[in-house]
Regions:
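Pyridoxal 5′-phosphate
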Residues: 1-488
């Protein structure tokens, strides 16, 4: 589908935009700090933005009560434990998860949730790990646990310019996996793990939630990375039932940081075997007897003392998001994304060449509010993303550049092959820039912008104005030297 060559002059002119007007009202009241000093925030995939009401609620709660370590039974401990328990129930309620089927484990972040699953999963020769190229490094890292257990690790490639996984490839890999063999051999206890993101943090592609059931029918547990999906999309666990869901709360509503969650089906959680124990995770332990008994609920996975002063803020954030409406946020983000893609597609140099190269879908279908792209000079060469980061910062735009901790999606977007990467590594390179030069890549990353709960039309318009006024018809070789790349 080709973008409309004459897009609307402003997102506000789009059909349906007026129906999302409450977002504009909230921006002017609860999120007015976003407009301080002419800043434009375009990194919701990196972190959400806290409403002023959230900060006030945290302040008021701490001043009105006294709370202490919930691992005790004194009044202040009971008060803290009560708030933590209320937050657990709020999480299940928000995601429409049956408390008899699901439980909530609080973690430091989504990465911590992934690690809990990886370190405790029963991998082995007949329990493989299946991943997509399009995964955050916190999910990719699970492969190290699988390999240490001598399990096979299979990756599903991305196809075409939209950077999607072909479902036929997924079915073929799942059917060929040892999980299916184990079932045929009459060993239903040993399963495989399939881990993928509901939404790509690189391209914004939304991978089908129907893959959860597809994999489970083939004997796999499913870990769904919802960190990029949940802030602007409804995840209903009464309809889609992954075995594990990883989340970071600051990505949903900006605050608190340092708190994430693993939502786990109780049946899947019972199959995990933790390699160690810590304070708060055990019912009893003996030093001389060399034995321990883990707790029999979610606390067996919550190491040490929980962040009991911040976890109650999760409940406030969920109530806040629910009062606004996830569907309303989804609609606003979809409109801004569609408009931006149309506008970027119309930007062309006087040479006729495109100014913007988008990685991923060029329409709003099957994607979220994350748009990743590179800019091109009139001669077709790429503008270094480090230059864009520097000049965007000067213009007051907060965006992201690099590979966004998603190397597989970047490799797919830039057309990098496994053979070429291995050859370059064997040749010996010491720096990121040397590696990129050896691969023949014109740049080491891309530019990512993302919309979220408080995004408004002027955010998208300011971005387009910046791109057009700064890079349209700008020749290569006019930039000042850039610092070396220290990481992707």
């Amino acid at each position: 589908v080709r973008p409309d060559p004459t897009p609307h002059a402003s997102p506000t002119a789009l059909p349906g935009y007026a129906a999302t007007g409450r977002i504009d009202e909230l921006r002017a009241s609860e999120y007015r700090h976003l407009d301080t000093d002419g800043q434009v925030y375009l990194d919701y995939a990196g972190a959400g933005v806290a409403a002023q009401a959230r900060v006030r609620a945290h302040h008021d709660r701490l001043l009105a009560g006294l709370y202490s370590n919930p691992h005790s039974e004194n009044p202040t401990s009971v008060a803290a434990g009560s708030l933590v328990g209320s937050a657990r129930r709020a999480v299940l309620d928000f995601f429409r998860a049956d408390p008899d089927e699901y439980t909530v484990i609080f973690t430091p972040n989504a990465s911590g949730a992934c690690r809990l699953v990886g370190e405790a999963y029963d991998f082995g020769r007949t329990a493989p790990l299946v991943l997509t190229w399009d995964n955050h490094n916190s999910v990719n890292g699970i492969r190290e646990y699988a390999r240490s257990a001598r399990a096979s690790v299979r990756y599903l490639p991305l196809n075409g310019p939209e950077l999607r996984v072909a479902e036929s490839d997924l079915v073929a890999v799942l059917d060929a996996g040892s999980g299916g063999l184990a079932r045929r051999w009459g060993r239903p206890g040993r399963r495989g793990l399939f881990a993928y993101p509901a939404q790509s943090n690189f391209s914004g592609v939304q991978h089908p939630l129907g893959w959860v059931e597809l994999a489970q029918q083939r004997g796999y547990d499913v870990l769904l990375d919802a960190a990029a999906f949940a802030p602007t999309n409804r995840l209903d666990l009464s309809v889609v039932r992954p075995d594990f869901v990883c989340l970071s709360w600051y990505k949903l509503f900006g605050y608190p940081t340092g708190v994430g969650a693993l939502l786990a089906r109780r049946s899947a959680l019972a199959r995990l075997r933790r390699p160690w124990f810590a304070g708060g995770t055990i019912r009893a332990v003996s030093v001389q007897g060399d034995w321990h008994r883990p707790m029999d609920d979610e606390s067996a996975f919550e190491d040490g003392t929980l962040n009991f002063l911040s976890i109650p803020d999760v409940e406030f954030g969920l109530r806040w998001l629910d009062s606004i409406g996830v569907d309303l946020v989804h609609a606003r983000v979809g409109l801004l994304t569609e408009w931006l893609l149309e506008r970027l597609a119309t930007l062309r140099h006087d040479t006729g060449g495109p100014l913007v190269q988008v990685y991923g879908p060029m329409t709003g279908a099957g994607r979220g509010g994350t748009v990743t792209f590179n800019l091109r000079h009139p001669d077709g060469t790429l503008v270094d993303e480090r230059l864009v980061a520097r000049e965007a910062a000067t213009a007051g735009l907060s965006l992201r550049t690099g590979c966004f901790c998603n190397p597989g999606a970047a490799e797919g977007a830039f057309g990098m092959s496994r053979t070429s990467m291995r050859q370059r590594l064997l040749a010996g390179v010491d720096t990121i820039d040397q590696y990129l030069a050896a691969l023949g890549l014109p740049t080491g990353g891309a530019v990512r912008i993302s919309f979220g709960l408080a995004s408004i039309a002027t955010d998208a318009e300011r971005l387009v104005d910046f791109v057009q006024s700064t890079y349209l018809n700008r020749s290569a070789g006019t930039e000042s030297p850039l610092p070396p790349r220290l990481r992707c």
